[in-house]
Amino acid sequence: MIEPTQVMLQTTVGQQADAQALARLAVQGAWAACVHVEPIQSVYRWQGEVREDAEWRLSFKTTQERLPALLEALKAHHPYELPAFYTLSATPLTPQWAQWVQDAVDPSS
C-alpha cells in the first residue's frame, strides 16, 4: 500500500483573479504540485444572516511536509477576513503520481 503522505487543502475566495493568484503563488513557491480552481455556489451564515454567493474553490495538492508552509502562505495572502482552510487526506493509488507530487513540492528542485 502506498503511504498517505499527500493531502488536499481546500479554501474558497470570491473572485476568480484572487483564486488564480493564490494558485500561482502556491505552485511557484513549490508548496503545491497542482491547484484545481472551480466556480461554486455557497450558502452560509455570516454575521447573523444566511447568504448565498458565487465563489471559487481551490484544491491544493501537496504533501504533509509542505502543508504548514502552504497554509502560512495562503493565510498571508487570502483576501477573506475569516478564510476557511481544511484538508482531505489523499492516498495516491499509483506510485508514479505520488512521486510527481513529491518532486513538484521539493524546494531543492
Labelled PLM ranges:
Residues 1-109:
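Positively charged, small/polar-rich N-terminal and surface patches that mediate targeting and assembly
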